[in-house]
């Protein structure tokens, strides 16, 4: 198969693994967009004497960063991880053409929406998100009601197409599942949270469609109802990637620990706890809104229930590692899974105080919150997704395994990425605890050192991720260049770690037996 044919097979996929690669490449593109936007907005934050004139550029970079992350990267990455979980469970994506159509159309439409340079924050609260006057423009380039309505309309359609992609994944998973067999733990989490995504993502489509009707049909927007509708999507979306990655950790960590999962029953029951919990705690994003006491108490209880599910995941995986004889951290996939788990513990611990009504005022709308969820992104999501990506590389080429040298450099890259970004996250959290508010371009000079440290550490850490990804890809492509075609393995890369000399002896002995016969 020529290089052009291979590219065509990803651009317009005809098999499960090609669909996975298509969505993976899409997610990496949006990761680049959100990363560039982040470094641009951080450039402004390193200066403590910003003119009000730079506010528009700062908030536009902030909004594009958020939209590219939450509305583009997250659904793409979730679909890639879930699709790969099906592949690893010997299930198939049947409707490859439809998945390609959903991918290309949704990305083009999201690009059109972002081309207007949105300037209102990723959660686009009313009334700012629907204003365009001498005081404020929700979009820097789309300043007329028609253009603003068009932007929200194409976003609605894009989100509907994304929802259709997850519905397709669910349908294809059950259509190809052998009767009487249950899904392995990776696919079980993938399918379960495809359902969560398919249920909650339409809330974003409805919210943006409401804005469209405001511009084209003069339908009034109720601020509180709109916010409630948005957060029914807005809270679960932060788990669209982490929860399928939980399935990946349940799948990989036992392999590299050399034993079965400590309790698969816990892992499977935990799906219900996490799935239901994530759709019931959205109100904790509305702590400063005039909510009744009963609802506030529900926020506390439901969030603790959700935290229990996360804690059970940590306990299950931790016991799997600690009761094993030896964990194979020298394999980059094993190393990535371990870093993801440790990062999730450290990032998750910070979140326990946030939903508590009596404590939240100390942290609400501060950089403490930013530090918490970015730690989760930089460790569990980025490192967890990198772990899956590396296994995708090995799975895509029959017989391929990373060399000892490339494995070493990928481990170095993972630590190189993780250590500085842990520092960034904790610097953000300390600044937030001291009173640094999020989304503010003008700030007291006392916080400038924190912003300088955060930007400096981020610049140090980024090459680590690039090193990990490029070394892995170079090693895989160097191997593939010696192969006539891309092919799917019949045996997992983990089980192929066999001494070559012993393998040759076995083959020779079998030939001898055949000759005697």
UniProtKB/Swiss-Prot annotation:
Write the record's keywords in alphabetical order, separated by commas.
Cell membrane, Copper, Electron transport, Heme, Iron, Membrane, Metal-binding, Oxidoreductase, Respiratory chain, Transmembrane, Transmembrane helix, Transport
Q: Where does Cu cation bind?
A: 235, 239, 284-285
Q: What is its main location?
A: membrane
Catalytic reaction annotation: 2 a quinol + O2 = 2 a quinone + 2 H2O
Q: Subcellular location, in the record's words? A: Cell membrane
MF terms in GO: cytochrome-c oxidase activity; heme binding; metal ion binding; oxidoreductase activity, acting on diphenols and related substances as donors, oxygen as acceptor
InterPro entries, per the entry: Cyt_c_oxase-like_su1_dom, Cyt_c_oxase-like_su1_sf, Cyt_C_Oxase_1, Cyt_c_Oxase_su1_BS, Heme-copper_oxidase_sub1
Cross-link entry 1'-histidyl-3'-tyrosine (His-Tyr), positions: 235-239
Q: Report TM segments.
A: 19-39, 64-84, 98-118, 150-170, 185-205, 226-246, 271-291, 303-323, 333-353, 369-389, 412-432, 460-480
The answer, when asked if ATP-binding is one of the entry's keywords, is: no
**Binding-site residues for heme a3, renumbered to this chain:** 372
Specify the protein's topology with respect to the membrane: Multi-pass membrane protein
Read off the PROSITE patterns from this record: COX1, COX1_CUB
Q: Name the SUPFAM superfamilies on file.
A: Cytochrome c oxidase subunit I-like
Q: Where does Fe(II)-heme a bind?
A: 65, 374
Q: Which GO terms describe its cellular component?
A: plasma membrane
The EC code for this enzyme is: 1.10.3.-
Gene Ontology BP terms: ATP synthesis coupled electron transport; electron transport coupled proton transport
Similarity remark:
Belongs to the heme-copper respiratory oxidase family.
General function of this protein: Catalyzes the reduction of oxygen to water. Subunits I, II and III form the functional core of the enzyme complex. Electrons originating in caldariella quinol are transferred to the binuclear center formed by heme A3 and Cu(B).
Protein's name according to its UniProt entry: Quinol oxidase subunit 1
Organism of origin is Sulfolobus acidocaldarius (strain ATCC 33909 / DSM 639 / JCM 8929 / NBRC 15157 / NCIMB 11770)
């Amino acid at each position: 198969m020529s290089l052009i044919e291979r590219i065509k097979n990803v651009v317009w996929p005809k098999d499960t693994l090609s669909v996975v690669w298509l969505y993976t490449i899409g997610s990496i593109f949006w990761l680049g967009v959100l990363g560039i936007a982040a470094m641009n907005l951080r450039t402004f934050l390193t200066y403590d004497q910003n003119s009000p004139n730079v506010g528009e550029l700062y908030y536009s970079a902030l909004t594009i960063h958020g939209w590219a992350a939450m509305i583009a990267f997250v659904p793409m990455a979730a679909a890639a991880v879930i699709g790969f979980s099906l592949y690893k469970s010997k299930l198939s994506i049947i409707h490859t053409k439809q998945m390609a159509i959903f991918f290309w159309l949704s990305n083009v439409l999201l690009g059109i929406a972002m081309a207007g340079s949105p300037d209102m924050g990723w959660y686009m609260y009313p009334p700012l998100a629907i204003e365009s006057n001498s005081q404020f423009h929700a979009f820097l380039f789309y300043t007329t009601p028609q253009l603003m309505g068009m932007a929200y309309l194409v976003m609605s359609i894009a989100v509907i197409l994304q929802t259709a992609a997850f519905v397709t994944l669910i349908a294809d998973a059950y259509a190809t599942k052998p009767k009487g067999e249950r899904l392995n733990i990776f696919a079980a989490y993938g399918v379960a949270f495809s359902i969560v995504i398919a249920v909650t993502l339409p809330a974003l489509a409805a919210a943006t469609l409401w804005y469209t009707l405001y511009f084209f049909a003069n339908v009034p927007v109720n601020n509180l109802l709109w916010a409630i509708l948005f957060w029914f999507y807005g809270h679960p979306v932060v788990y669209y990637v982490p929860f399928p990655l939980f399935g990946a950790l349940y799948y990989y960590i036992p392999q590299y620990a050399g034993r079965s999962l400590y309790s698969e029953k816990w892992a499977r029951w935990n799906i219900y706890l996490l799935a239901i919990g994530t759709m019931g705690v959205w109100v904790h994003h509305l702590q400063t809104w005039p909510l009744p006491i009963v609802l506030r108490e529900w926020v506390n209880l439901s969030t603790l229930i959700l935290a229990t599910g996360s804690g059970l995941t940590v306990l299950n995986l931790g016991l799997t590692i600690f009761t094993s004889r030896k964990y194979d951290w020298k394999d980059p996939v094993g190393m990535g899974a371990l870093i993801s788990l440790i990062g999730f513990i450290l990032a998750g611990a910070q979140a326990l105080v946030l939903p508590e009504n009596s404590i939240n005022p100390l942290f609400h709308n501060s950089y403490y919150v930013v530090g918490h969820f970015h730690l989760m992104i930089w460790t569990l999501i980025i490192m967890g997704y990198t772990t899956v990506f590396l296994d995708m590389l090995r799975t895509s080429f029959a017989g391929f395994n990373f060399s000892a040298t490339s494995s070493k450099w990928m481990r170095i890259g993972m630590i190189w990425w993780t250590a500085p970004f842990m520092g960034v996250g904790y610097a953000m959290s300390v600044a937030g605890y001291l009173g640094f508010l999020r989304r503010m371009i003008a700030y007291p000079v006392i916080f400038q050192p924190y912003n300088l440290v955060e930007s400096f550490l981020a610049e140090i850490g980024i090459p680590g991720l690039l090193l990990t990804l490029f070394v892995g890809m170079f090693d895989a492509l160097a191997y593939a260049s010696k192969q006539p075609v891309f092919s799917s393995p019949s045996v997992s890369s983990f089980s192929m770690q066999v001494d070559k000399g012993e393998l040759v002896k076995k083959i020779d002995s079998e030939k001898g037996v055949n000759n005697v016969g």
